[in-house]
């Protein structure tokens, strides 16, 4: 494709590319295609390489946009690709490298061209470009074939039917990337696309029966986490006799461009993490998230979302009364293992959220696991490093915890799992702590971080809801976890007093004043009192349901008993304070009777004895604290920009000009 090219700048002068985009039609049978497609490359793996590639070929692509209505060369290139893919499965089985090599190169060029098309012309115009043939200017033959649907269908077939081998890795990655590129029109629209011709092609017609197989294959690509084969290890190995036809063809026709791109160190050097990651697994996961978040309508539900919602475990032999046509079976054990291992990435956390929220089969399976710590610990680590994470990742991690805490079995079992030496928790050395106590510590830390930095009410609400769901099942709380619960209450009470003082001063200052309105301290006070009420309910729930299991909680409560005095007569808290007040009074009296200067051990002993003697009927019953996560209306307004921001930032070898992106701001997330 570029025998004489030596730099990226010269791409725009490359004779083969100029001919493809020029004013002359090229027949599908011409030797030109063999020359065009005979180059060696590794697909660009970072956006820096892709940016250089796009800038180098932009003028070529624009020429093709201008000339294609007359030449039909885009359609010719696509037909050449389609013809090369017809024997692809057999080629993979027979290790026929030449066929796979040329099919990959054709798809790579198509992908590069269409990526520029999507930023330059509308969806409707793009589809029109697929219909142009080499006839009179502007003529097209819409009836003879639907080349666009043919391409989509071919890409899906390729992904689901070609086995994943070293030999086929690059073309499978390119096929997944091509589908992402075809769907990327959403990036260039501020509003969510509800009517998209490309979406309709994917969700109807020939592509529809392949929905479940595509979703299953993308999930398995994520599960397998296959590393990219070493560059050159699977493409045209030189024979001992000096190289066969294939090697000679590759090296002879294709010196230049792609070696500059990939071996010459163009662009930024990848980090060790990038080098070790699986491009195909990452790209497959991104495509799966894009597909499952496409908008649907009552008359045309999103089949990809249905597939994600209804798939089952391979060991599940039950028969659904109303089976979904897009359901399938997959190994849940393998899926669970990969989900546990991959939580450092936003997209893996978003997949976990999606499956827990939408697929009841996955949720039931996860909650029944005996090694829940393998999933929960990575989620807690995300929250612990809240300063380093984007807000969306933190939200997803938090909502996952909220969904898990809706289950009483989960809330009980996490206190039975004992962990040793949590190295990433640096506030205090935790030589031994239950998973439940660690979860409480991390959630409280998230609340405190939010109070001092972001002040996001939504974050507060979800943190407190998770603690509330757990509170009746608190068991053997670690002394530090109990202290942090009371410390958080102390922080809230100080904040309450400060806002109350500001509100009082504001009221005095505003009397007789006609100046601009002052801050709404009444609203601030209302918010802080809601949070305090919630914390009191959490403490009360623990005391009324599991006091005898939590001597450390009673100890922490007694140690800071003066904190609660100001709320005893407060109209917003009087009812909930009755139980807390009674517990404080009961145990304070027992400690007085036990004598002065008691050691910590002796105090805990008195508390344990008192817990048995405490008359439970004197504690007022309150409704059980139960909060359930519910997606807000029009969730696509949040999830579609989020998914595409992940594609933009994490897509392998994908670059879009930030000035063209309308869907989200560059600092969002």
From Swiss-Prot:
It is found in: Cytoplasm; Golgi apparatus. Pfam families: Dymeclin. Its main location: cytoplasm. One of its GO terms (cellular component) is Golgi apparatus. Keywords: Cytoplasm, Golgi apparatus, Lipoprotein, Myristate. GO terms for biological process: Golgi organization. Necessary for correct organization of Golgi apparatus. PANTHER family: DYMECLIN (PTHR12895:SF9). Belongs to the dymeclin family. This is Dymeclin. The lineage of its organism: Eukaryota, Metazoa, Chordata, Craniata, Vertebrata.
């Amino acid at each position: 494709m570029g025998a004489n090219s030596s730099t990226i700048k010269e791409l725009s002068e490359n004779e083969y590319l100029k001919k493809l985009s020029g004013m002359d039609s090229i027949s599908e049978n011409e030797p030109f295609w063999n020359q065009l497609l005979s180059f060696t490359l590794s697909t660009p793996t970072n956006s820096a390489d892709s940016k250089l590639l796009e800038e180098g070929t932009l003028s070529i692509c624009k020429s093709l946009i201008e000339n294609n209505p007359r030449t039909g060369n885009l359609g010719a290139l696509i037909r050449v690709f389609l013809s090369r893919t017809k024997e692809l499965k057999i080629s993979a089985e027979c290790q026929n490298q030449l066929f796979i090599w040329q099919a990959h190169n054709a798809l790579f060029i198509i992908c590069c061209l269409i990526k520029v098309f999507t930023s330059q012309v509308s969806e409707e115009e793009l589809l029109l470009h697929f219909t142009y043939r080499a006839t009179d200017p502007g003529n097209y033959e819409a009836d003879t074939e639907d080349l666009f649907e043919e391409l989509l269908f071919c890409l899906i077939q390729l992904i689901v039917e070609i086995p994943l081998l070293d030999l086929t890795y690059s073309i499978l990655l390119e096929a997944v990337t091509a589908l992402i590129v075809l769907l990327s029109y959403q990036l260039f629209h501020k509003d969510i696309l509800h009517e998209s011709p490309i979406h309709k092609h994917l969700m109807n017609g020939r592509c529809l029966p392949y929905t479940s197989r595509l979703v299953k294959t993308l999930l398995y690509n994520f599960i397998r986490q296959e590393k990219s084969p070493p560059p050159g290890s699977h493409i045209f190995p030189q024979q001992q006799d000096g190289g066969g036809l294939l090697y000679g063809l590759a090296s002879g026709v294709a010196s230049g461009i792609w070696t500059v791109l990939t071996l010459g160190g163009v662009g930024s050097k990848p980090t060790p993490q990038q080098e070790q990651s699986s491009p195909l697994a990452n790209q497959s996961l991104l495509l799966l998230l894009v597909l499952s978040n496409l908008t649907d309508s009552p008359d045309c539900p999103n089949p990809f979302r249905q597939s994600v919602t209804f798939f089952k475990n391979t060991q599940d032999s039950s028969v659904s009364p109303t089976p979904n046509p897009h359901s399938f079976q997959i190994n849940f054990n393998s899926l669970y293992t990969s989900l546990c291992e991959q939580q450092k990435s936003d997209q893996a956390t978003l997949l976990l959220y999606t499956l827990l929220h939408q697929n009841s089969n996955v949720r039931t399976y996860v909650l029944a696991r005996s090694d829940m710590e393998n999933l929960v610990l990575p989620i807690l680590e995300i929250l612990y490093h809240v300063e380093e994470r984007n807000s969306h990742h933190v939200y997803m991690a938090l909502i996952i915890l909220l969904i898990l805490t809706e289950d009483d079995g989960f809330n009980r079992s996490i206190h039975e799992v004992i962990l040793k030496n949590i190295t990433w928790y640096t506030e205090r050395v935790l030589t031994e702590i239950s998973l439940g106590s660690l979860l409480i510590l991390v959630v409280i830390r998230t609340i405190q971080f939010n109070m001092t930095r972001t002040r996001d009410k939504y974050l507060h609400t979800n943190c407190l809801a998770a603690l509330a769901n757990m509170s009746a099942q608190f068991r053997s709380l670690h002394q530090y976890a109990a202290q942090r619960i009371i410390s958080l209450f102390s922080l809230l009470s100080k904040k309450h007093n400060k806002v109350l003082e500001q509100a009082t001063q504001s009221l005095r200052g505003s009397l007789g004043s006609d100046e601009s309105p002052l801050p709404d301290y009444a609203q601030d006070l209302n918010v802080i009192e809601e949070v305090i009420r919630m914390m009191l309910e959490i403490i009360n729930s623990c005391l009324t349901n599991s006091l005898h299991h939590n001597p450390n909680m009673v100890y922490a409560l007694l140690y800071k008993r003066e904190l609660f005095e100001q709320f005893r007569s407060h109209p917003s808290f009087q009812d909930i304070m009755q139980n807390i007040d009674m517990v404080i009074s009961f145990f304070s009296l027992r400690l007085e009777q036990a004598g002065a200067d008691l050691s910590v051990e002796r105090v805990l002993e008195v508390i344990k004895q008192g817990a048995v003697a405490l008359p439970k009927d004197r504690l007022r019953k309150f409704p059980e604290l139960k909060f359930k996560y519910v997606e807000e209306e029009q969730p696509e307004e949040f999830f579609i920009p989020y998914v595409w921001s992940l594609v933009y930032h994490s897509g392998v070898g994908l670059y879009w000009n930030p000035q063209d992106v309308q869907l989200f701001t560059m600092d969002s997330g």
